[in-house]
Every structure is written in C-alpha cells, then in structure tokens.
C-alpha cells in the first residue's frame, strides 16, 4: 500500500507550456489557403463569363479582392473587440480553437473568469498542436481570419446563400450577413459592366500649361471604362489613388469630343501618351507603360464612343434641308433651277438608277453627298471592258468611255468612295444615316492623327466602326494582319469576306455600299479658273465659282473646235478683270471631283474629255451660266 500510494501522484502529468506558433507562418498558411480557393473560383468565374477573360483580369480581380479583404477584416476586428466577452466567446470558430483536456481547460479558463467555460470551446476531431494556446487578443484576431474566410465563400457564391435556409444565429449576425450580401450583389453588377481597367498616370492639361518646364504633377490612377447601368452608355472613371473605392473623375463618353495620341511636339519627353478632350473644356493627358497599351486604350475608348442616332439624324436632316438651302439662296442662283431640263450625257443602266445626274443643280449636288452606291456596281464597272477606277466620282455614270492614252496614274482621290480629309465625326454621320438598315455602308478617309494613313469607316449594325489602313510606296494595302495588292483588292475581299473586328464577337460585316463623295467648296486662290464655254456662255467674275462645276456640266462644248474657241473667248473676256486663267475641266474623266488641285491634271482633263462630250447639252447652256454664282 505504501508503495502503491505515491504511484498515481508521481505519474500525474505536469502541464508543459505550449510553444507559441510563428505568426508569419500562420499568416502565410491562411493566405495560401485563401489564394488557392479564390484562384479556383476565379477560373470558374472566367469560364462562366468569358467576356472578362482579358490579359489583365487576374491583376484586376486580385487587387479588388485584396482591397475588400482589408476593409472587411478591419470592420470585423473592430466589431469583435467592441462586443462583450460573451459575444467574443461565441464568435470563435471551430477551426481556430482546439479541444483541450478537462484539466488543461480548467487551468486555462481560471485566469479569464467564468464567462468562458469549457462548453464554449467546440470539440473538433482534428487537433492542431500549433494553434493550441490560451485565449488572447492575438488568438481572437486569428479566429476572425477564419471567419472572414467563411465569409469569402459566401461572397463567391451569394445566390445559394441568399436562397438557403436561415441559420441559427444572433440577430446581429443575420443583419450583418444581409448587409454584406447586398453590398456583394451591387459590386457584382458594376463588375459585369466593366469594359477595361488598368493602371495609368494622368495630369490635367491646364496644370501642364501652368507648370514651368517639367514641374507638372503626374498622378497615378486606376482608369476604368465601364457601361453606365442607367443610361446604357459608357463612362470613363479615374480612381485616385488607384485603390480608392470611388472615382475622383467620372466622364461620360458622350461628352468626349476627341481621343488621340499626342504628337512629338506636344509631349517631347513622353512617348506613350494620349489626350482626352471633353465638352466642358477639360483636357486630360494620360501616360501608359508602352505604345501597345496606348493604342489599345485609344482604340477601346473610340470604339465605345457612341455619337447617338438622334443627334446624327438631326444633323443630317439639317444639312440636307434648311442649312444648305440658306447657303444656296445666298448665292442668288435663281436660274440654276432651269438646268434640270437640260439634256444630260447618256448614263449606264447599271448605276443610273442609283446615282443621279452629275451636278444638275444645287440641291442635286447636296443630295449627292448622301447617295449610297452599291459596291458591287462599282466593282462590275472596273471589271467591264475598258473600265477603270479613274472616273473620279463618276464611276458608273458615264460607263467605260475612257481614253487609255490620256489616263494618268490613279490616286485615292480619284475614286468616289474616298472623302479626303473628312473628320471622324462627319464620317460616322454619313455611314450612320439610316441606322442599322444601312449595315455595311462605308467611306474611306484620311487619318486625322496619322498623316499618310487612311481609315475605313463603316456601319456595323447601326454603330460606326473605324479600321485603319496603311499604304506603302507600291500601293499595297495593309489592314490589321492582312495584306492586299491595292485598295481595290481590299474592297473586293471585304465585299465577300467578313471584316475581322478587333472587339471580337460575330463579325458578320461585309462592305455592301459606299457614300458617294461630294465636291468640296473651292478654296480662294490668286487666279480663278474660267469655265470652258461657247462665246455665249461666259463668266466675268473674278471670284471662285461655288457652282462652277455645275456650269461646266450644263455647258459642255459641242466639238473640240468649240472648246478651243470657248477657251480663247473666256480668256479674252476675263483678261480685263483678272488676267488669263487656266480653263476648268469639264465633268468627265479626272474631273473636278478629284481633290487634286494641280494645274497639270486640270489641263489633262480638258484635253482628254473635250472630244467626248455629247452635243445635246449645247442648246440651253447659255442660260445656265448667265448669272454669277460667286460665293464670297
């Protein structure tokens, strides 16, 4: 008995202090678990929503994830610390607190009072020795991390949580969970509407002008291009600093009047910058990492800019009607309306139904800017025997009656679908006239931002798209990744094959018709050209004729001898006022519709077309040009 008595006392275990685990290892462990879980859900989200599968999607999602984690973690820690001891004891999750032996629990529970008993600690089967420690503020914070991770699971799939049966929890927990779910759904709606997001640097142009030298302040920002839910339009938002939850600047894309890359003289020290100009006069300069990002941002913003159908219809109707009518009336051209009854040159039946007579009167000239000519008709004219594309903008109007010997080298300005230095806004208005029913209507114009390059503007389901064209010295055309021997080959290809769109999606767009170009108003010059006419059809005005092309079309010479006599008579009659002037070409091959103003081409046009004009237009020509149509 004496030997057995002290046995149990000697065998009683002495409590050994548990070493405190490394907090860095703990943070890394839970961060890895959260990252792996979020990565799987992120990949699943991209598979379900391929619209967000962009190269920088991972960075954007992770930044948003980290920012929300910090906010929620701080709020949860403050809530737990403010709550009473009982609430704190109930908030401890099962994974953070490990089951203890009865005697160990009693030893550890004594210093903290009776508000925390052994029954409050959950009994979990899997025991982790590294987190077996007493209750402390650090332990509570680590337990909150597990609670936040559970909340992430609910945030990743809010729909099942919203539809699930209510769990047994305190009213405060239910209220906070409902609040978190509502904020999650609102954030998800905004995330769905994001078009593009990236980190850039920007400054206001006024600050750049006010600063001396390079003292202008560049600010880091997170640029977000998204669709506004209410108006169904896009907005551009600047988040300063990049982690800010609300934008510092929010610009609707309908208020942006210009988006372009900067010229070397504008930003000599910065290569990868572009400019945003807003209607209220504000101007923002943004800097990207490389040239690729710069051009892609400009293309995305320009692609999302939607001018709006109602405004374009208003402008086009004004241009077609009252606005141009006032200009015609100011020219005092009362006799011009009689030119409608004059005989006209024979027209080909292929295009005669589509294109009206060239320059019969002022309103016809205005209407020509909105004439839509089928591209197939233009291509058939080129393929016809003797046909060529040199017929300026009369391709298909006078058939294939061309003189090969007098045909000079062709330029883009010789074709009816080329509109010269037409602005981006005006080009969009031309192709969008009529809305989606004019799907495939196009024009080709010079680039506003890149001299020497051209832009194909076309109607894509009621929206204007702009595709850049590059021409080398041999006339070869480069469109995206495709090369063509000429612009005509490019038109033939895209007439039968869909155009590859950079935005992706169903590219069911082919070129169907084009907007026929209009004569630009003549520019004032030192020596005005005189229209070739008979002795009875002459003009002694020293100014440029706004309707001189109309007069030339209405008064063609009946024969080469008449043309020579008309030229000499016109020169002698106008010498008293302004001296001799070179004759203006008659409407025909390489006529004034070509936007080349060199005198050599004008002389070639007269020599090539003097013998081709029909004599039927001679009887009424004196009346058509008797008035002065000078436009001052």
From Swiss-Prot:
GO terms for molecular function: SH2 domain binding; signaling adaptor activity; transmembrane receptor protein tyrosine kinase adaptor activity. Keywords: Cell membrane, Cytoplasm, Membrane, Phosphoprotein, SH2 domain. Residues 381-409, 516-537, 558-632 are annotated as: Disordered. It is found in: Cytoplasm; Cell membrane. Tyrosine phosphorylated by JAK2, KIT and other kinases activated by B-cell receptor in response to stimulation with cytokines, IL3, IL5, PDGF, IGF1, IGF2, CSF2/GM-CSF and cross-linking of the B-cell receptor complex. The modification Phosphotyrosine is found at residues 52, 629. Residues 193-306 form the PH domain. Residues 400-409 have a biased composition (Acidic residues). Residues 558-579, 604-626 have a biased composition (Low complexity). SUPFAM superfamilies: PH domain-like (SSF50729), Phenylalanine zipper (SSF109805), SH2 domain (SSF55550). Expressed in spleen, prostate, testis, uterus, small intestine and skeletal muscle. Among hematopoietic cell lines, expressed exclusively in B-cells. Not expressed in most tumor cell lines. InterPro entries: PH-like_dom_sf, PH_domain, Phe_ZIP, Phe_ZIP_sf, SH2, SH2_dom_sf, SH2B, SH2B2_SH2. The modification Phosphoserine is found at residues 141, 310. Residues 417-515 form the SH2 domain. Signal peptide: none annotated. It holds the Pfam family SH2. Residues 519-532 have a biased composition (Pro residues). GO terms for cellular component: actin filament; cytoplasm; cytosol; plasma membrane; ruffle; stress fiber. Its main location: cytoplasm. GO terms for biological process: actin cytoskeleton organization; antigen receptor-mediated signaling pathway; B cell receptor signaling pathway; B-1 B cell homeostasis; brown fat cell differentiation; cytokine-mediated signaling pathway; insulin receptor signaling pathway; intracellular signal transduction. SMART domains: PH, SH2. Adapter protein for several members of the tyrosine kinase receptor family. Involved in multiple signaling pathways. May be involved in coupling from immunoreceptor to Ras signaling. Acts as a negative regulator of cytokine signaling in collaboration with CBL. Binds to EPOR and suppresses EPO-induced STAT5 activation, possibly through a masking effect on STAT5 docking sites in EPOR. Suppresses PDGF-induced mitogenesis. May induce cytoskeletal reorganization via interaction with VAV3. Belongs to the SH2B adapter family. Homodimer. Interacts with KIT/c-KIT, SHC1, EPOR, PDGFR, VAV1 and VAV3. Interacts (via N-terminal region) with SHC1. Interacts (via the phosphorylated C-terminus) with GRB2. Interacts (via its SH2 domain) with EPOR, INSR and KIT. Interacts with GRB2 after B-cell antigen receptor stimulation. Interacts (via PH domain) with VAV3. Interacts with NTRK1, NTRK2 and NTRK3 (phosphorylated); after stimulation of the receptor by its extracellular ligand and subsequent autophosphorylation of the receptor. Binds INSR, GRB2, ASB6 and CAP. Insulin stimulation leads to dissociation of CAP. This is SH2B adapter protein 2. It comes from Homo sapiens (Human).
């Amino acid at each position: 008995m004496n030997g057995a008595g002290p046995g149990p006392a000697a065998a009683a275990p002495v409590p050994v202090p548990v070493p405190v685990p490394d907090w860095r290892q703990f943070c890394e462990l839970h961060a890895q678990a959260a990252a792996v879980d979020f990565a799987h859900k992120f990949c699943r989200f991209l598979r379900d929503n391929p619209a967000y599968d962009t190269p920088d999607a991972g960075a954007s999602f992770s930044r948003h994830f980290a920012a929300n984690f910090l906010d929620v973690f701080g709020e949860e820690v403050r809530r737990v610390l403010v709550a009473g001891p009982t609430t704190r004891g109930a908030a401890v999750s099962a994974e953070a607190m490990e089951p203890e032996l009865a005697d160990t629990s009693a030893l550890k529970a004594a210093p903290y009072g009776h508000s925390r008993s052994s029954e409050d600690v959950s009994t979990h089967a899997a025991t982790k020795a590294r987190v077996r420690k007493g209750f402390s503020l650090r332990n509570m914070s680590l337990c909150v991390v597990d609670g936040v991770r559970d909340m992430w699971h609910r945030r990743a799939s809010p729909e099942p949580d919203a539809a699930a049966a209510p769990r047994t929890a305190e009213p405060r927990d239910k209220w906070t969970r409902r609040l978190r779910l509502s904020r999650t759904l609102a954030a998800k709606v905004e995330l769905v509407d994001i078009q593009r997001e990236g980190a850039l640097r920007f400054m206001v142009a006024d600050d750049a002008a006010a600063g001396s030298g390079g003292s202008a302040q560049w600010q880091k920002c997170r640029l977000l291009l998204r669709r506004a839910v209410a108006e169904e339009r896009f907005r551009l938002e600047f988040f300063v600093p990049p982690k800010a939850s609300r934008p510092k600047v929010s610009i609707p894309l309908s208020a942006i009047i210009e988006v372009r890359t900067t010229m070397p003289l504008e930003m000599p020290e910065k290569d990868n910058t572009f400019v945003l100009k807003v209607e209220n006069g504000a101007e923002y300069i943004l800097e990207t990492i490389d040239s690729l990002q710069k051009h892609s941002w400009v293309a995305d913003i320009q692609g999302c800019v939607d001018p709006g159908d109602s405004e374009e219809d208003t402008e086009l109707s004004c241009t077609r009607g009252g606005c141009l009518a006032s200009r015609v009336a100011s020219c005092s051209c009362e006799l011009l309306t009689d030119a409608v009854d004059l005989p006209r040159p024979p027209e080909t039946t292929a295009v005669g139904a589509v294109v009206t007579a060239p320059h019969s009167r002022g309103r016809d000239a205005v209407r020509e800017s909105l004439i839509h000519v089928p591209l197939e008709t233009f291509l058939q004219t080129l393929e016809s025997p003797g046909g060529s594309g040199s017929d300026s903008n009369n391709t298909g109007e006078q058939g294939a009656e061309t003189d090969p010997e007098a045909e000079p080298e062709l330029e883009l300005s010789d074709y009816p679908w080329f509109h010269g230095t037409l602005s981006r806004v005006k080009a969009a208005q031309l192709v969008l006239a009529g809305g989606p029913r004019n799907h495939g209507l196009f024009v080709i114009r010079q680039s506003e931002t890149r001299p020497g390059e051209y832009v194909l503007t076309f109607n894509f389901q009621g929206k204007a798209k702009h595709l850049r064209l590059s021409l080398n010295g041999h006339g070869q055309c480069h469109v995206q990744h495709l090369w063509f021997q000429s612009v005509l080959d490019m038109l033939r290809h895209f007439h039968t094959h869909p155009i590859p769109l950079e935005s992706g999606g169903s590219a069911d767009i082919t070129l169907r018709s084009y907007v026929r170009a209009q004569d630009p108003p003549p520019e004032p010059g030192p020596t005005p050209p005189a229209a070739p006419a008979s002795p009875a059809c002459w003009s002694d005005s020293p100014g440029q004729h706004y309707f001189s092309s109309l007069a030339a079309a209405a008064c063609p010479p009946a024969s080469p001898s008449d043309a020579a006599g008309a030229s000499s008579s016109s020169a002698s009659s106008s010498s008293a006022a302004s001296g001799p002037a070179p004759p203006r070409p008659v409407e025909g091959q390489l006529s004034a519709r070509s936007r080349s103003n060199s005198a050599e081409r004008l002389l070639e046009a007269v020599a090539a077309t003097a013998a081709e004009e029909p004599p039927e237009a001679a009887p009424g020509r004196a009346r058509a040009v008797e008035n002065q149509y000078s436009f001052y």
